[in-house]
């Protein structure tokens, strides 16, 4: 993802063609990675937050459940959690990026471990 504020990005499962999110946001610096989704009341349908580089996240102080996938640099899902509750930690030894999605999105898109995710400009 570039830093172009005009560009729109979506997250697609390469195996199924399903769009996991059509409003993709990145947390690539230290401050934005620390903040993540903290302070939000919910996560909108179609939204996703990519946190990179990281191989661990927490949901401390969060007010809602989320789906989380950890991917390799190549975009392969190495670990995932559905409906991760607040006040939890989640890590993936081989993870490079964490992608946080609204709870239920992984099941709705038939996304499984080993799938490759890709970012598309549209």
What residue ranges belong to the model's regions?
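Compact, glycine-rich, soluble single-domain proteins
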Residues: 1-122
């Amino acid at each position: 993802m570039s830093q172009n504020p005009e560009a729109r990005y979506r997250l697609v499962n390469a195996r199924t063609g399903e769009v996991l999110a059509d409003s993709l946001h990145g947390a690539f610096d230290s401050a934005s990675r620390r903040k993540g989704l903290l302070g939000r009341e919910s996560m909108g349908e179609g939204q996703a937050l990519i946190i990179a580089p990281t191989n661990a996240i927490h949901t401390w102080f969060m007010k809602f459940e989320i789906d989380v996938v950890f991917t390799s640099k190549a975009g392969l899902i190495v670990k995932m959690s559905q409906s991760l509750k607040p006040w939890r930690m989640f890590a993936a030894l081989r993870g490079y990026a964490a992608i946080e999605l609204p709870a239920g999105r992984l099941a709705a898109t038939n996304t499984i471990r080993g799938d490759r995710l890709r970012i598309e400009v549209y």
